[in-house]
Amino acid sequence: MTKEYATLAGGCFWCMVKPFTSYPGIKSVVSGYSGGHVDNPTYEQVCTNKTGHVEAVQITFDPEVTSFENILDIYFKTFDPTDDQGQFFDRGESYQPVIFYHDEHQKKAAEFKKQQLNEQGIFKKPVITPIKPYKNFYPAEDYHQDYYKKNPVHYYQYQRGSGRKAFIESHWGNQNA
């Protein structure tokens, strides 16, 4: 199997895993921290907003089965791409959305997707999700991995209570909500 990586941030990483897990060609989705200047940060360190990291997921995928463009289609249906100050009731640097590109193809695909979404006028405000070069990724602690499976009741309550589920459904219907 050929494999590539997509590293994407969209607020709380708990909500960024489930939409990707059953999609063909996706081999794994790992919650973690990306983009910062501290090696192997902990959740507590990242939450201080002093490490430069954002909560993110790293997706391993088979490019012969699915494309980075398909992953972006899913990604943009999981968060509010018009808010760069955090997501829903999670505010601050560690919850900012970011696309971390691994190569020029991913960079161009991300730029095109942002432009396409802005032209389609799906959102009332412009899509402003930053596109940055991939720097690093550190897996989060075990209790954060597959959170939606380990804590389904809390996961569902979090999605509803934060406003994420309502936002996604208002823009995309029940897709990925």
From Swiss-Prot:
It catalyses: L-methionyl-[protein] + [thioredoxin]-disulfide + H2O = L-methionyl-(S)-S-oxide-[protein] + [thioredoxin]-dithiol; [thioredoxin]-disulfide + L-methionine + H2O = L-methionine (S)-S-oxide + [thioredoxin]-dithiol. The active site is at C12. GO terms for biological process: protein modification process. It is an enzyme of class 1 (oxidoreductase). It comes from the Bacteria. Its EC number is 1.8.4.11. Keywords: Oxidoreductase. Pfam families: PMSR. The keyword NADP does not apply. GO terms for molecular function: L-methionine:thioredoxin-disulfide S-oxidoreductase activity; peptide-methionine (S)-S-oxide reductase activity. Belongs to the MsrA Met sulfoxide reductase family. Has an important function as a repair enzyme for proteins that have been inactivated by oxidation. Catalyzes the reversible oxidation-reduction of methionine sulfoxide in proteins to methionine. This is Peptide methionine sulfoxide reductase MsrA 2. It comes from Staphylococcus aureus (strain Mu50 / ATCC 700699).
